[in-house]
Amino acid sequence: GYPVDLSLSPNGTQLITSYMYLDQGMIKCKIVFYNFGLGKNDPNRVVGIFFPKDLGDAMAGRVRFLDESHSVIFSDKGIQFFSTRVETSPELVSQIPIEENIRSITYAQDKVGIVTDNVEGGDPYKLRIYDREGSPVFEKTFNYQYTGFDIDGDLVLLYNDSSCKVYNMTGTEKYNGTFDFTVSKVSAGRFPGTLLVMGPQKMTEIKLQ
């Protein structure tokens, strides 16, 4: 098959790769787990192969190790969470089908976030945050034209070049404001309850609500 994306575990011994391949004229996807420390029984170091059958003809465009024993697969049909606690036997622990159009994804060491279209009316977008096992943390609809989407510590950050919107992990809005300079990046501040807003010419730290 053709590799689409790959991710190395933090200690460098495990690798996930998403492949596209042709099967009877249909393009399909498979996820392959490799282990270079313990996978010696297989000359290719393969310890697990998964076909996202339940997600139909999904294409897994992004695969990521969150830490040594948790990984996540993002496809156009949903999210799959895997455990490699037993390094020679990767296990699918949670699968979340997503029917709406997925606009953005983000991930941190212990959280995963997606923004989809909101098909239920009202606000145009829906934000969903999950923990590294795939359990829902919160979901919220919003109406905000963002270009950046990140998770930093216990903050979810949505921002564009002139403003930002910030939620905590209960879905409470902690900040919603504009800036008088061009914004290139927003992150959690140096101290709890603060936000660092960075631009090409300026950097400012603000206090959250």
Name each region found by the language model.
Residues 2-3, 15, 136-137, 147, ...:
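A broad, structure-centric signal for solvent-exposed, well-ordered loop/edge residues
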Residues 4-21, 25-41:
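Long, internal scaffold/assembly segments composed of regular secondary structure
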Residues 1-10, 48-68, 97-110, 141-154, ...:
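Repeated scaffold domains used in trafficking and secretory/extracellular systems
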Residues 1, 28-54, 75-98, 121-141, ...:
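Surface-exposed loop/turn elements that mediate protein-protein interactions on large endomembrane-trafficking
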Residues 12-25, 62-75, 79-81, 106-121, ...:
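Short beta-strand elements that form the blades of beta-propeller/WD-repeat-like
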